[in-house]
Amino acid sequence: MDSQKYCFKENENVTVDKACFLISNITIGPESINLQQEALQRIISTLANKNDEIQNFIDTLHHTLKGVQENSSNILSELDEEFDSLYSILDEVKESMINCIKQEQARKSQELQSQISQCNNALENSEELLEFATRSLDIKEPEEFSKAARQIKDRVTMASAFRLSLKPKVSDNMTHLMVDFSQERQMLQTLKFLPVPKAPEIDPVECLVADNSVTVAWRMPEEDNKIDHFILEHRKTNFDGLPRVKDERCWEIIDNIKGTEYTLSGLKFDSKYMNFRVRACNKAVAGEYSDPVTLETKALNFNLDNSSSHLNLKVEDTCVEWDPTGGKGQESKIKGKENKGRSGTPSPKRTSVGSRPPAVRGSRDRFTGESYTVLGDTAIESGQHYWEVKAQKDCKSYSVGVAYKTLGKFDQLGKTNTSWCIHVNNWLQNTFAAKHNNKVKALDVTVPEKIGVFCDFDGGQLSFYDANSKQLLYSFKTKFTQPVLPGFMVWCGGLSLSTGMQVPSAVRTLQKSENGMTGSASSLNNVVTQ
C-alpha cells in the first residue's frame, strides 16, 4: 500500500475509523511508522476531545441531578407542610369533637347524678316516714295516735317521694355524636399533585381599544377549576407583530386578576402599539404565557416647540407659562448690536434664554411682539385627532386652536386666515369667543375647566368641547389646504397640555350629529372685524 496516499493535511478532519484503518493497513516501514504515529496522535486527540465532551455532559448531568435533588427536597418540604396542615386541621377537628362528646357526657352524667341524689333523699325520707307510720300503729292512747296520724298525713302530703318524677331526664343514647368519614376518606384518597395550568388564549376579536382604555379578553383552552388567578403583562412598542426580544421597554405586570377580562384605563398612547400576554396561576405555580397579542394604540403625540415660541413664554414639553422677564437679557444684547449697525432681528439661537434648550427644531422665526404664541412640534396632515388643554385658574388671556406653518411671527391666533381658535379673556371683562381671519363670534357658553380640541383634517372640521362633559362649544367648517399645527397663545397665566389621546367615543358620536350645524368659519364672515 502506497504510504504517500495517507499523508495527513494540516487541520484535516480525520475520523477515528479512518485513523484506525490507516494504522491497520499501512505497510511496516520507516515512513509507515510516521504515518501510524500521526494517525495514532489523531486518535488520541479525538479521544481526548470526546472525553472532554463526555465529562462536560457528566458535569451537566450532575448539575441537573443536583437541581432535581434540591427541587425535590423543596417539594417534599412543601408536601410535608401541606400534610402537616391537614393533620393539624384533623387534630383540631378531632379535639373539638372529643370536647363535644365529653361535654355531652358530663351534661348527661350531671343530670343523672342529680336525679339519683334527689331519689336517694326522697327514698330516705320515705323510709323514715314508713318506719314512723309503722311504729304509730302500736300507739294505744287515742289522743297520741290521732296526733301521730295527723303528723303522718302532713308529712306524706309534703313528702318529695310523691312529687318526684320517676322518668330519667336524659337517655344513655349518644348516637347523635357518631361520625361517618367515609366520604371524606374518599376525598382524601383523591388528593393529587396540582397540574400546571395551560396557557390562556387571548381573543383579539373580543379585545377593545377605545377612549384611551384597552380591554383584553382571554379564555382557557379547557375548563380548569384549579385556577386561582391570572397575571396580565403589557408593554408599549412601536413595532407591529410579535414582541421583540430586545424591545427597549419592560413588561408591566398586573397580578391577581380573578376574571378572564381586564381593562386598563387612563392610558397615554405615546406608542403605536401595545403588546399583551397573560398566564394562569393555580395555588402552586404559574403556567406558560399565552401567545402575545399586539394591539394598535394610535393617537396624536406632540410636544410644544420651544424653538419658535415667544421669549416671554416659559415652554416645556406639555406646558407653557407666561414669563414677563423672559428675553430681557437678549433684548439688551440685540439693542447693543443695533447700535453697532448690526441687524436687530433675533435668530432662534441668539434669542434662546439661558434656561431654554438650544433651538434644535428652529425651522421658522421665533414669535415676537404681542404674539405670545407657541406651536406644537408635529404637523397634522390627515386623519382625526384630539387633545386637551387646561388653563391655570388665574390665567388672564389665552387661545387654543390650530394654524398653518406659515403663520407669521407677529401674527396672533385667529387674526389671520391661516389660523383658527377659541379665545378666553378674563382681563377687565370676561369674553369667550371663536376667532378666524380677524373676525370674532361670541360664545354664549360657560368657559370649561378643560377644553378638548378635535381636528378632522380630511373632513375640514375643527371643533372645541368641554373636555369633561363633552358639550360642543364651537365648530369650524373649512378646507385645510396645508398641514396644520396645534397652536396656543397665553398671557399672564399658563396652559397644560394632554396628548396621546384617542378621539373620545362621545366626540365621534357628536360629530355625526353636529356636522350640519351652522357654527362654522363661514359664519364669521358677517362678524365685525376687531
From Swiss-Prot:
UniProt keyword annotation of Signal present: no
Coiled coil: 102-141
Residues annotated as domain B30.2/SPRY: 300-506
Compositionally biased spans, kind Basic and acidic residues: 330-341
Region feature (Disordered): 322-366
One Pfam family it belongs to: SPRY
SMART domains, sorted: BBC, SPRY
CDD domains for this protein: FN3 (cd00063), SPRY_PRY_FSD1 (cd12901)
Residue ranges with Polar residues bias: 342-354
Residues with Phosphoserine modification: 520, 523
Protein name as it appears in the record: FSD1-like protein
All residue ranges annotated as the Fibronectin type-III domain in the record: 196-300
Keywords: Acetylation, Coiled coil, Phosphoprotein
This protein's record includes keyword Magnesium: no
Source species of the chain: Homo sapiens
Occurrences of domain COS (ranges): 137-194
